[in-house]
């Protein structure tokens, strides 16, 4: 399809990605080849003529390449992310220029590999509470990395069994006082792969999926590192043992440290998208080739003709498009901020968007792949189809890089902060605006309301998702205010008692942003034929959002029972109308055929020997018995 530039993997980048993927199919050096592809991307990109400003678009290229690599092998994509986005990102975002020269450039040249050690046995999402300690030894000008208890053991650490260095988060302690979590570069293995004294690495062995990543446990027993190994962008220790930071508040400093690491959440969104698109391509291709049932005395019909098959797959395809457009939007903002040298700590709305997208996209990926598996029947259960493999590999996406419920709390806190800031500028004006907005929403749902928008049109759907977000935001503000200010309760208990409301508001916000970005993509599409098809999927996505929350809309009288039935009918009709054009859409994903390895989709791949059923070396016992029965 034409006119989809910037929304999917563009053709020049597809060629580069396909070249990298073909390169990766070699029998040896799988991860090494992948790392080469990531490291040499700026040079290859220039040769391919992709971008004029390679530096400005470098983050975009890395994220999209991560999406493509996830289609090849999820484990490989994740391990590349560990090396360059997590470990490398910690050095470049938390370290000084000297740290970048000393650690990052050798990493890029593949002189060593690293790992990212933040999660502990006792603390995962609550990074502030980690128990690993880095105590400054003034006499020796060293930090002593130690773990006072078993709960401080670093767990689920990717590349733990092979990495040479680790970016270790620990409480920085000077003269018995903690300055909060900081990041340190700790040597793990020498050039021969031998662990340094005081370091223990334990293989966590088999997991549900992603077994190509060597997750392990790291234990430090009084490991000494030079003072210079502290990544000191937000906090440094002088030779005389004095702590200095450009940010005086410990809480603000901690938030700044974490903010610089949030781009990895957007990377997870891109990786989830890669798995989602591949699963949909396989399931949709299969549904257009497989036939089951049909009218009496007539040919069986393709299973995509069955209503539930189309409903399940087309709804997910619309969601994949919406997440694609929204993630590209977030990527553009991130790329521009980094290119202009803006601090991510000041981009709270972007942090919230990346956190919300990570939660929404990974939950949708898990749901999508489950439906893809069911829609492909027994073949979906076979490893050769790759869907079951993708399911197992991506299940962890909902908890790593931040548990999804925690991610949604990041979104809600930012929305509350925006609400508070808006009303603090001018208290009287804020009260008036709040009153008029509330009155307007009540009028909109009263018997006096006169709705000029046809139920189900794009304008109606956009207003519906905006209405839901506004109402949930005001409702959460009033609940928190009542519990904390009126009832004098503590904030933690008040927040916890509103958690269902918090997650509902955050998802409503992401739904609204996604539908608006989808609408923008439709309007910017230069090709009329493509624009018409995109509009159908945009309507389908918006209709799906309203339909899945129809109970809430009925409760708030935004929908009447009749309107709810119209929404359901529109959802079914749209799925029916786009099911044949879905082949064009998945073709526009530009997924390299070398990555698909699913013969039942009708895509030949002679390089995928593992997807074939080999002939037995000798006749099976049951075959001999069957031959005897044939003679009787």
UniProtKB/Swiss-Prot annotation:
InterPro entries of this UniProt entry? ACOX_C_alpha1, Acyl-CoA_Oxase/DH_mid-dom, Acyl-CoA_Oxase/DH_mid-dom_sf, Acyl-CoA_oxidase, Acyl-CoA_oxidase_C, AcylCo_DH-like_C, AcylCoA_DH/oxidase_NM_dom_sf
Under Gene Ontology molecular function, one entry of this record is: FAD binding
Q: Which Gene3D superfamilies match?
A: Butyryl-CoA Dehydrogenase, subunit A, domain 2, Butyryl-CoA Dehydrogenase, subunit A, domain 3
Mention one GO biological process in which this protein takes part, according to its record.
Answer: fatty acid beta-oxidation
Keywords, comma-separated and alphabetical: FAD, Flavoprotein, Oxidoreductase
Which EC class is the enzyme in? oxidoreductase
What's in the GO CC field?
A: peroxisome
Q: What is its EC number?
A: 1.3.3.-
Q: Which Pfam families does the annotation name?
A: ACOX, ACOX_C_alpha1, Acyl-CoA_dh_M
Keyword Oxidoreductase on this protein? yes
For whether the record's keyword set contains Protein biosynthesis, the answer is no
Residue positions annotated to bind FAD are 376-381
Its needed co-factors are: FAD
By sequence similarity, the record places it as follows: Belongs to the acyl-CoA oxidase family.
> Which PANTHER family did the record assign?
ACYL-COENZYME A OXIDASE-LIKE PROTEIN, ELECTRON TRANSPORT OXIDOREDUCTASE
Protein name in the entry: Acyl-coenzyme A oxidase-like protein
Source organism per entry reads Mus musculus
